[in-house]
Regions:
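Alpha-helix N-cap/helix-start motif at helix boundaries, enriched for small hydrophobics
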Residues: 70-72
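Hydrophobic alpha-helical transmembrane segments of membrane proteins
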Residues: 1-58, 74-146
Length: 146
């Protein structure tokens, strides 16, 4: 299973999945819809699944001498790892914004949603819905997205 996860991280993952982790820094932009960070992380994961489909990664992996359930577990573990990394980055930046930068005028007079614990909860809901709808739908067919 760990070798399949390494394969997902090194070969099957789209570079966008890693680049879009930097969008967690949007948490620090005042007056910006910060939930867009979660959207970009899900978009990067979608691109990884699409690239894997175009490269016949599922067929290649199914031909390897591994259990078929481990293939699904490794793909899902990759998805959860990227989402947890993004969530942790957002959590660190949110805590920094709530403590060290709480008195900054650009954050106190913010018309949009401030970075707080509710924001982190909505990110978790967004990632959970992505896993429930997209990832589950992908593994019903594995050759059709969603």
């Amino acid at each position: 299973m760990s070798k399949l996860l390494k394969k997902e991280l090194r070969l099957a993952a789209s570079p966008l999945s890693y680049w879009f982790l930097a969008f967690a820094l949007m948490t620090m932009i005042p007056g910006y819809p910060i939930l867009v960070c979660g959207f970009f992380v899900c978009l990067g994961l979608f691109q990884s699944y699409q690239a894997a489909r175009e490269q016949n990664d599922v067929i290649y992996t199914a031909l390897l001498p591994v259990a078929k359930t481990d293939i699904v577990r490794a793909k899902f573990a990759f998805t959860v790892l990227i989402e947890c990394t993004a969530w942790l980055l957002c959590a660190v930046l949110t805590l920094m914004r709530m403590t060290a930068l709480s008195a900054a005028p650009v954050y106190t007079q913010n018309a949009m949603m401030n970075a707080n614990l509710v924001y982190l909860g909505w990110l978790a809901v967004l990632f959970g819905l992505f896993n429930l709808i997209f990832v589950r739908g992908y593994f019903k067919t594995a050759y059709a997205i969603g």
